[in-house]
């Protein structure tokens, strides 16, 4: 029987839009049609079973000889990508799966184009579902509650399946369908984005780690400001809180890491962030509090936003039970129990320490009071938001609380209620939070760290960092704006990281040590007023990269696309040679010399480019390459070759070409010295007056502006009604002129070309 959008189980085959996706489907597998207007493009898969248990596994059928890409948790905290063609290649803890159902799976023998089938394992009651494969190529549902006493499940709505010819649309519609079904989270498009995303920032972590002091924060901000690149937000990371160990706890010692045995001992700051503070002695004097630090750094450094770090449980080891002044949170030591799927993937020193020492878990019924006390204090001293870390630890603590899903919902509801009350700009960054317990419980949180950390001293981690964020974003970007993490501007891979963030649509912030900056690089990202040219969407892989492996196959480049108001941008990266090793459970360089890779960029790599063209567009475009400085006219359905050596990148600005009635053609590139050149164009209008054309633009920033004009030198270029000198290259059609440094923040230049 056919249900949903052409989805059926026929003769033990799961058939989607005429394509066989799974075969050997067991008789206990259910396919339930979705209901409601938003759900017409999909159906739910579930199982019937008389089995009970807090951890159950069921087969859905065999997946064979079809290309897929999935994102799965390779650590308790984080996801990464995996590509393959058979079910046995699907790892445990897979939370998103997309399968290419091509001609070979067409049961009717007809010549059909590919369809894309998305599988989203979701929450049902107190259980969470994930996908995994087995050696028989079966795609399995793993169902888990996280509490041995929670063992009864319904089983009818465990996985949502959607299909269509446009992979990006299918993914978005699938998540929106689950949103309507669950009613427990909101899609990214319906969330308020905090303004800090639009400005350059600095984070204390890789500069000082937990040793950070108030003096260090001032020094870091002043060092960047002195170079002419002024941060507008700062994240004071781990190291500001009042923490301590139990007498019986075992200290965790590792380079550049926190002591995970520590617990929170006070809501307020430690002595390092008090005026004239002394170790081991904190005072409750408002005039000496964290507020004096915030006031100082905001007033002296033109800061707009200050965020501070805390764990979702207060600190890594939770809140210390019975400590004076915090008894009313009713913290009790609990011992984490990780799921088998996570345990099979990594050896985590953090989890090992917390498991050994336990975690002081605030009573879920008191956790809003805890968050509100913490956040209201922070807001009162001038803090604008928080980076809430260690979130996935909650899934290990569900026993005795009705299970992992119920505990996560209580904590996230309380957290978001406190954020709404205390930080009106929705000031929260979600971190170490790549599980669906949290994603499907987030109604308001709008920013999420999208991959494992930037590891400055691990050469194997950099290329996989870029690839992981891009592929994770296919899933995470439907829930929140992905955050690509901090990076160092002075580093062998600094340009590589910077270029990726320029196309990511994300916040841009560094963790440089004072005095260790590459200001020339930062000026390609940051305007003089501290704002950035942030693209409109989460940066995602182009559709032709979905099923190729840019990390391991020795032949594929990674292309990441995004949109500006009137242009597109594509970042191309050679990521080959290193990745996460599932055997050694660490990042590993598997090829010291992965070689040069060739590929191409096309106009339609920018998936929704037609939506931002300010006219009826024929499909021709101008492509400007940032590193090579070349301007190329690219006719519709043609491509531009690109060749990159290992760890190299290139950024292309892609601009729809406007053809006027006199045959002349025009396309604005933007600020040519910036990575995301086209992000500077805020408005664009074409007036076609037959014998002449007029182009009116509003631009942000300063520096060299480039536009394409095909057949003649422009008659004039004016900026704010003043004629300006310009240069015209008839061979390429490139017109360039310079914008000065505006006196006002976010100033818009009025540019007219005719």
UniProtKB/Swiss-Prot annotation:
InterPro entries hit by this protein: Aldolase_TIM, Glycoside_hydrolase_SF, Glycosyl_hydrolases_36
Entry GO MF terms: galactinol-sucrose galactosyltransferase activity
Induction: Not induced by oxidative stress.
Coiled-coil positions: none
Substrates-to-products reaction catalysed: alpha-D-galactosyl-(1->3)-1D-myo-inositol + sucrose = raffinose + myo-inositol
Protein EC: 2.4.1.82
Enzyme class, first EC level, given as a word: transferase
Keyword Transferase: yes
Keywords: Carbohydrate metabolism, Glycosyltransferase, Transferase
Function: Transglycosidase operating by a ping-pong reaction mechanism. Involved in the synthesis of raffinose, a major soluble carbohydrate in seeds, roots and tubers.
Record-stated family: Belongs to the glycosyl hydrolases 36 family.
Protein name: Probable galactinol--sucrose galactosyltransferase 1
Gene name of the record: RFS1
